[in-house]
């Protein structure tokens, strides 16, 4: 294998260079006697790049790392697409890429061609200098080389009054973990939860907050600029080059008042945010530059020159920005973000057993209870050791009410979970209670509850009637089933169809003695089966709940069979004539 790869790379124009013969001062191992690298010169319109390939232990499934040993002088210190830290060439998205891992020759010939193509595209991007550079699309911030992290708990905008705090925590190893956190003033509760969940000390909030400025940047170019900036002067120079309006706003904000500590949050159009933390030396700037009369004409260039002075910025750090606002946290769980998320719905979950426990966690990650509207969990049972094998709760919750323990678990999961409540009693199936919710989920698996919910819901007018979702395991764990009752078909309609059910039993299970499989004792009934069925039922129920955000429901019944038989396709059931609930 090594000989085949060696000859393939030599055939592509690489030369094998022992580690000890590599240039000094590079970030590769140049001392090992056994190591070596494959080096090649690539010609582009901008000059010659010298690339060294670093091979991994298994070259079949890991593509080589491309290290830039040398690049044209005019590009040094400038932002080139796909080149990070000045030496790392990102020629492929390896984790998403696919290649024939059993054909080394073709794979490494493709690597050679891809390196050439990447370098050509990078040089062309610098020379064109456009603002909508496809080579930098969505990855401009990757070249920022941040020194510390800033987490945003709110969407950045010019109107948002963000305040930031530096928080610290001592790890068990004795080292200190620190980060900057920015939030709006009305997010004080979320901010405290963020600190607690991430094991930071709340006392950090007693310190004076850091003034945070959000500045929109619409650059006229991205590639080719000197990058990354290492001081405030270089930041201002960059802004002046690419967006003079953002440059003027930055200078104006910094000179507006006597504030030592600032965070500049740059919202670069079409890219992720960048941030800078800096401390201004107010004595150097001088009192005469603060609180200027608005009627007096400013000289932005003079003020920028002052701010860029050698002794003005006492501390400067590039911050990596990570958004942790509600929309960002929920974004990957939305196939269609335009329909919104469950934070806008009032939801009741009846039953916090196996299905309800898994479903509650899924709904949280779709936004339930993460806004002004509430997410209520109902169950009057407690969590016991024999529930553990099929439940999401842990041994910490033994003896506690399922609903309250589950609600606490959800609230501890993320800082935006602010409207979740566990209620340690049965759900009161009354019209006035049902009308308080948009969605009521029946995860009890009890037919009497399902029938009563369907009947009482029909005493409400359509405008205030909630959507009922029945999620249950059937056939003693052989099937996962979900029915959505939006007024067109109820639980009784489903059970009354003689083509599917007889005596409330699915015809597919008539030949099975279901009662014999159950373990029944006074006050306790259970059926042993794999928890996978409840996972599937919860997943189907989550899909059903998310479908209520759409203008029309794609289906109102879905199932999955786990006994090897064929599952019916999701479908729309209609009202059944003779249903003793709908026809009364």
UniProtKB/Swiss-Prot annotation:
Sequence segments annotated as region (Linker domain): 138-338
The UniProt record lists the keyword Transferase: yes
Matches recorded under InterPro entries: Prok-E2_B_dom, ThiF/MoeB/HesA, ThiF_NAD_FAD-bd, Ubiquitin-activating_enz
GO molecular-function term, one example from the UniProt record: transferase activity
Enzyme Commission number(s): 2.3.2.-
Mutant lacking the gene: phenotype: Essential for CBASS function; when the operon missing this gene is introduced in E.coli it no longer protects against phages T2, T4, T5 or T6.
Keyword line: Antiviral defense, Isopeptide bond, Transferase
BP GO annotations: cyclic threonylcarbamoyladenosine biosynthetic process; defense response to virus
The protein's role, per its UniProt record: CD-NTase priming component of a CBASS antiviral system. CBASS (cyclic oligonucleotide-based antiphage signaling system) provides immunity against bacteriophages. The CD-NTase protein (DncV) synthesizes cyclic nucleotides in response to infection; these serve as specific second messenger signals. The signals activate a diverse range of effectors, leading to bacterial cell death and thus abortive phage infection. A type II-A(GA) CBASS system.
Protein's UniProt name: ATP-dependent ubiquitin transferase-like protein Cap2
Organism: Vibrio cholerae serotype O1 (strain ATCC 39315 / El Tor Inaba N16961)
């Amino acid at each position: 294998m090594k000989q085949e790869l060696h000859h393939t790379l030599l055939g592509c124009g690489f030369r094998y260079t022992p580690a000890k013969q590599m240039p000094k001062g590079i970030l590769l191992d140049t001392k090992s006697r056994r190591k070596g690298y494959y080096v090649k010169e690539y010609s582009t319109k901008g000059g010659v790049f010298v690339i060294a390939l670093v091979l991994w232990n298994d070259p079949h499934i890991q593509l080589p790392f491309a290290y830039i040993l040398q690049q044209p002088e005019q590009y040094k210190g400038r932002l080139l697409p796909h080149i990070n830290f000045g030496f790392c060439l990102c020629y492929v998205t390896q984790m998403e890429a696919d290649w024939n891992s059993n054909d080394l020759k073709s794979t490494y010939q493709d690597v050679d061609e891809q390196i050439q193509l990447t370098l050509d595209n990078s040089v062309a991007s610098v020379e064109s200098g456009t603002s909508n550079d496809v080579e930098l699309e969505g990855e401009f911030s990757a070249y920022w080389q941040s020194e510390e992290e800033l987490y945003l708990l709110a969407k950045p905008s010019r109107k948002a009054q963000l305040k930031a705090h530096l928080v610290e925590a001592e790890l068990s190893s004795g080292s200190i973990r620190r980060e900057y956190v920015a939030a709006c003033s009305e997010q004080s509760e979320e901010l405290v939860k963020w600190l607690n969940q991430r094991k930071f000390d709340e006392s950090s909030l007693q310190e004076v907050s850091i003034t945070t400025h959000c500045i929109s940047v619409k650059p006229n170019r991205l590639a080719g600029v000197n990058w990354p900036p290492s001081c405030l002067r270089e930041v201002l120079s960059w802004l002046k080059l690419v967006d003079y309006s953002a440059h003027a706003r930055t200078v104006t904000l910094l000179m507006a008042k006597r504030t030592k500590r600032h965070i500049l949050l740059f919202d670069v159009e079409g890219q992720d945010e960048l941030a800078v933390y800096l401390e201004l030396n107010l004595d150097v700037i001088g009192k005469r530059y603060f609180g200027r009369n608005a009627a007096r004409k400013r000289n932005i260039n003079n003020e920028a020159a002052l701010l860029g002075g050698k002794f003005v910025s006492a501390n400067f750090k590039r911050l990596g920005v990570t958004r942790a606002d509600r929309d960002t946290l929920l974004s990957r769980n939305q196939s269609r973000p335009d329909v919104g998320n469950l934070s806008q719905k009032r939801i009741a979950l009846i039953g916090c057993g196996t299905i309800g426990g898994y479903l509650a966690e899924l709904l949280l990650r779709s936004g339930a209870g993460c806004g002004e509207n509430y997410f209520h969990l109902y169950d009057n049972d407690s969590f016991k050791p024999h529930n553990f094998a099929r439940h999401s709760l842990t041994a910490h919750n033994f003896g506690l009410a399922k609903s309250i323990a589950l609600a606490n678990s959800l609230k501890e999961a993320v800082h935006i979970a602010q409207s979740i409540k566990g209620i340690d009693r049965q759900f009161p199936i009354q019209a006035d209670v049902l009308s308080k919710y948009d969605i009521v989920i029946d995860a009890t698996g009890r037919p009497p509850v399902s029938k009563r919910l369907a009947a009482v819901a029909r005493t409400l007018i359509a405008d205030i009637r909630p959507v009922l979702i029945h999620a249950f395991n059937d056939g003693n764990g052989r099937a996962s089933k979900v029915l959505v009752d939006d007024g067109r078909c109820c639980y009784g309609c489903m059970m009354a169809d003689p083509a599917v059910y007889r005596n409330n039993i699915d015809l597919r299970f008539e030949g099975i003695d279901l009662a014999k499989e159950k373990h029944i004792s006074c006050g306790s009934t259970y059926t042993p089966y794999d928890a996978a069925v409840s996972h599937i039922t919860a997943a189907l129920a989550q899909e059903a709940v998310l479908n209520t955000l759409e203008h029309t429901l794609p289906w109102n019944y879905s199932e999955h069979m786990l006994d090897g038989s064929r599952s019916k396709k999701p479908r729309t059931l209609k009202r059944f004539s003779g249903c003793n609930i709908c026809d009364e």
